[in-house]
Amino acid sequence: MLEHLSIQCADVAASAAFYDWVLVPLGGVRVLDIGSVIGYGVPPNPDFWLGPCTTGEGFRESHIAFAAPDRLAVRAFFDIAVASGAERLHAPRVWPEYHANNFGAFARDPDGNNVEAVCHAPE
């Protein structure tokens, strides 16, 4: 039920380089660049935003889950993330504790956030 999500990045360019690639298998692309803020989504609607850090309170990890159309897209997301140097958190697999078709993979983005691609469709 999210309309949009925005995260603050220590290095917007590094985060943009990461998300430019990992969102492709999920159908997401860079939609808008407005100064130092970048919006991603399925055109024409940006629903995931990157911007520079505006608070000096230190890092707080976010968990961001992106919907994947199928399990192949989850695997591609993970492979691209790891190839870009992201820390592997959890390789693609079924997470039966949520439900029988919850297939997800997790990696850490350049700012340390836990990013996930998840598909709920059966194999």
Positions of predicted regions on the chain:
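Short glycine-enriched loop/turn motifs at secondary-structure junctions
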Residues: 1, 57-60, 99
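Long, continuous compositionally biased terminal/linker segments
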Residues: 41-82
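Core segments of cupin and vicinal oxygen chelate
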Residues: 7-47
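Short beta->alpha transition motifs characteristic of CBS
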Residues: 5, 99-100, 106, 118-123
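Glycine-rich acetyl-CoA-binding "A-motif" of GNAT/NAT acetyltransferases
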Residues: 114
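Vicinal oxygen chelate
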Residues: 10-13, 66-111
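N-terminal beta-strand motif that seeds the catalytic metal site of vicinal oxygen chelate
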Residues: 1-16, 64, 121-123
